[in-house]
Amino acid sequence: GKMNFTDCGHNEIKELSVSNCTGNYCVIHRGKPLTLDAKFDANQDTASVGLVLTAIIDGDIAIDIPGLETNACKLMKCPIRKGEHQELIYNIGEIPDATPEIKAKVKAQLIGEHGVLACGWVDGEVQE
């Protein structure tokens, strides 16, 4: 469902949805599939787009989330043009059972050839 998120770019993200979550807080369950859906307005022309997903724990400890797709062009059509409305849909699949039970901010960044394309984070936690 639609999440309330904090923008860490320049308001490029128009809507962010996470499967089985809504509102201000997302509880992610191990062993359950997860889908992210982000709608954003492109702030640059770029042929390549990187995706960086980071868990921020205790306010300032940032951990890259391993095993995830880093080439956002596999999740949406590239190249993209400045001013275009874009949608990225990422079916992450099942959250591994080895994922620790933690509370964290999950920060997602899209990086284009000319810097940050979009950036947003949500509050959440991983549970059994």
UniProtKB/Swiss-Prot annotation:
GO cellular component: extracellular region
Lineage top rank: taxon: Eukaryota
Keyword field: Allergen, Secreted
SUPFAM superfamilies to which the protein is assigned, alphabetical: E set domains
Xref: SMART domains: ML
Keyword Secreted attributed: yes
Keyword Secreted tagged: yes
Name this polypeptide is given: Mite group 2 allergen Gly d 2.01
